[in-house]
Amino acid sequence: MNFEKLIVKHVQELVPYQSARRIGGHGHNFLNANESPKSEGYFLNSTTFNRYPDCQPEELIERFADYAGVHKSQVIATRGSDEVIGLIVRAFCEQGKEGILIAPPTYGMYEVAANTNNALVATVDRHEDFTLDANQIIDAVKSSKFPVKVVFIDSPANPLGIVFKKEELEKVLNALEDTLIVLDEAYIEFAQKEHDLTYLVKDYENLVVTRTLSKAFALAGIRCGFAIANENIIKALLKVIDPYPICDPVAQIAIQALSDHAVGMTLERAKCCNERREKLRADLNELPFVEKIFESHGNFLLVKFKDGPKVFNRMAQKGVILRSFETKKGLKNCVRISIGSDVELEELIRYLKELDI
């Protein structure tokens, strides 16, 4: 039997998202996935594990809504914010006819979600310094050869680390009232408070903000994310989500993580991470083969080396796993370094100082 003939044509051509775990690497010091270097302790009540969970656990939705400063009707919980991205494309883009707009280099899951759902992909060029303004996005949407239903903007951006300004976002929202604007705030806890634009959801019906517990909350392993939007968008997403997206252990842990005390610890952890990030920046600036260190509002630094592949490969040989962006648009010789623990970062700098480049 020729199984290829059974597979849908666009699925045959898919390239899976190359996550840090999928790329792999043998090492002991993993600075490639923007994870927290430390896991917190939580408790589980196993007496309900024999029952199917609620699709949207009420206490979890209420806790996150309180944390984000929105009404619970404006929130949907998902298996990480990656699932939200896929749900948005599935619910709002007609297969083969409509699509999304992205601004490379950006988070790879936007394009993967579009390809998986047979949606089209348009791109907009960034400025030479990788910044992005409203006029670029508006012009790209209006000049697209197909209807752009969704625009994805990550802020802080991954892997660039920069933020999208409030005035630029509002200009886009006002000019593209019939387009869904998705603001990915996966790293927002590491940024200054003024960069959190979630509150704009109350003023703009076409704005969706995505969040995750994977980064600052140090819960990448449980896969829990959220979308914040007007009630009609949330209802549409609930139509295409699986029946039981949030399993009971995940809900229990996430609810604990969103308590006032735990949130306070998370924000303090993010502050300490930022301090380590700037210490790492200072240490890297002393190395003669570092050409540029990008601005960062996340738990990572994007670094341009004189020879990025050599740095990446030599660190891997030492068991320090970084993330290369060598093949991404405009990022030749660039390597992203996650902000690990003091010990992990000290080891990285020690090995980098041994390099002859």
Protein language model regions, located:
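PLP-dependent aminotransferase-like
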Residues: V11, E58, A91-I153
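N-terminal "arm"/small-domain region of PLP-dependent enzymes with the aminotransferase-like
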Residues: M1-E59, R63-D66, P147
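Conserved PLP-binding catalytic core of the aspartate aminotransferase-like
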Residues: N274, E286-K318
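PLP-dependent aminotransferase class I/II
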Residues: N206-E286, K292-I293
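Active-site phosphate-binding strand-loop segment of PLP-dependent enzymes
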Residues: E128-A191
